[in-house]
Amino acid sequence: MRRCRGTLLVCGGLSGLVGLGDTCRIEPRSHNQRECAWRAAGDREPLLGEVVALDEAGVHLLPFSELAGIGLDARVTLARGHDRIRPSTRWIGRALDPLARPLDGGPAPPWGAASYPLHARPAPAHQRRDFGPRLDLGVRALNLFTPCCRGQRMGIFAGSGVGKSTLLTMLARHSDADALVVGLIGERGREVNALLHQGLGSAGLARSVVVVATSDMPAMLRRRAAYLTLTVAEALRDQGLAVLCLIDSVTRFAMALREIYLAAGEPPTSKGYPPSVFAELPRLLERAGPGTGDGSITGLFTVLVEGDDLSDPIADAMRAILDGHIVLDRRIAEDGRFPALDVLRSLSRSAPAAYRPEERPVVEHARRLIRAHAETAELIQLGAYRRGSDPLIDEAIAARPALEALLAQDVDERSVLADDFAHLAVALGHAYPEATGVGV
């Protein structure tokens, strides 16, 4: 070890043996230093770090744990095998840390037969299938206005406290995917515990693999948790399963990347994010989608927007990468309607092809009414609009209570795709094949 600055370690003698992304083992030489390092790490496992830069000064490492007990006389060696993992379907029902160690008090998860690289390349574009059939998300507002097909990747964009985590809980409970892989990146420990025990519940956890990296973990582990989440999802997809991959949040993954690349010496650009952050985002997210076989990974990724500003650099990059965006609005949340979906600002790139022929006119009609009401909301609130001035606005005012009731949904309520469109058709006065006996 030559130098320790902040969280960055610089060592010599390995420049010809390691490359970027390799994992190294860091071994304190003295007994006292080893004991101190083990106490800081919380276990007696070897201390690991990843190579993030190489230059004439030596090999630059960022550690997977705290640096307590590490001195300049520490010995650094190449550690092989940490860039691959062997997931198994027997991981379903388990909560794991970024190194695939159990967090639920159970035994170590059994390894699968096939080995997967954590940083695998996405499938070649010419080998990918198109979107699969529509996925019933179990959330009425999303089924109606932002349809999601198997293999699609969508973002949930919102500021803090607008209901992203609650919406993820609903998706985890109510969607009809075969299996779920949930990545909690940079979350508070209390929220992780609440999601595992109250949010998912026993039924949701029984079909989920949960990967957790809390906010107090080093940036390298927060980054690794996101890659482990996608790797587990790929392994389940290769078993022919329709996997729903939920990551909360991509913004905190990007913040971890910012820490890593700034420590490695990259210059900051847009809002302090180095260029490599924007290069790495698609490398992670492109791994979701339809596979080359029967399985698929449908991805729903939350994006925390600063000050509810969708032009934030990470939010802007995510909209360009993903196949749709679900926007949650603070004003709607403050009015008490959850999920706080902003229908007019949300978009699914699988629409309108995802809709059946009888569904499309109903949804288009509803969107026209919602837009008409939004454009004249101020006049209506001031009492300046006179009924009869515009038939479309009159219809929008009359339909608003029914539309708001349809968009609202309790966390424990599960909607059914066919019934959702039938209810919307009845609310708007459309004839609908499956609307028999359905009332609002």
Question: PLM features: what roles do these ranges have?
Answer:
Residues 1-94, 102-103:
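N-terminal accessory targeting/assembly segments
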Residues 33-35, 83-87, 102-108, 126-132, ...:
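Active-site phosphate-binding and catalytic loops of NTP-dependent enzymes
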Residues 74-76, 83, 90, 103-152, ...:
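P-loop NTPase nucleotide-binding/switch module
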